[in-house]
Amino acid sequence: MRGTTMNKIDWNNLEYYDFIGFVGVAAFLIYALYFGTLWYVTYDYRIEMKDQMVEMYQQISDPIPPIKDDYGVKKRWLIYYIVGTREFERDLTSDEFDRYGKQLLSRGWKIDKKYTEIDRSRKSTTMLLSKGEFIFEITWWEDKKICRFHLIKEDWIYDKGF
């Protein structure tokens, strides 16, 4: 450029706002480099994990045969998880829901927690199960023909909080 002279940075007499600017730019570059590298390095692992979770979800049995099985693979930062809804021909009874928990126990799942909530005059029962690194949550509402499922894998990426 014509008429412009470039001055060297005087490191001995650096002003406060110039210093803050350098620190801010350096912090942003380190942040971008860290997460960009993490995303790139874990890409194949995350795709493999997603496929493994879909396979695990499809292998989970049903309390009674469903009319419709609607699920989707969701992503939050670097973690994939599955959210699904299965619709049945009729309402499930609490005995059928308990038998379903026992059926999952025989397939290697472990019931970590089971609780019932009443919210806005609707009663729901939730079972939280685990099998290895997988966490599976089932919610059933009384007088509704659906169950909601959540499946997530607790691995090293999940433990990091991503």
Question: Where do the language-model regions lie?
Answer:
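An acidic-aromatic pocket/loop used at catalytic or ligand-binding sites
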Residues: 7-162
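Short, Lys/Arg-enriched N-terminal segments with co-localized hydrophobic residues
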Residues: 1-5
